[in-house]
Amino acid sequence: MFEGMDLGKMGKMMEQMQEKAKELQEQAKNVEFTAKAGGGLIEVTANGAGEVIDMNIDDSLLEDKESLQILLISAMNDVNKMIEDNKKSQAMGMMGGMNPFGS
């Protein structure tokens, strides 16, 4: 079952992947994603670690609580999806070129 697999090489690759994952987590804090809802009435910005770092709400929404809630939820979901897509993309990139079964 494990014929042809270099376990030492695989262990080293796992260490490299862990180091790269830590590196990517640190870099994620410096990447920003912005989502807009309601034609720009609400704008939410978060970093790659998922922390909301800025939010703009148009004054016209302050009197309409229901619309504000709907648009805020939409913008938050959109920015979270952007962050998740970025994480998946980075994970796939990290896996590229790694072959535990030898050359």
From Swiss-Prot:
GO cellular component, one term: cytosol
Annotated localization: Cytoplasm, Nucleoid
GO molecular function, one term: DNA binding
UniProt xrefs under NCBIfam families: DNA_YbaB_EbfC (TIGR00103)
PANTHER family reported for this sequence: NUCLEOID-ASSOCIATED PROTEIN YBAB
Oligomeric and partner information: Homodimer.
Name of the protein: Nucleoid-associated protein SUN_2278
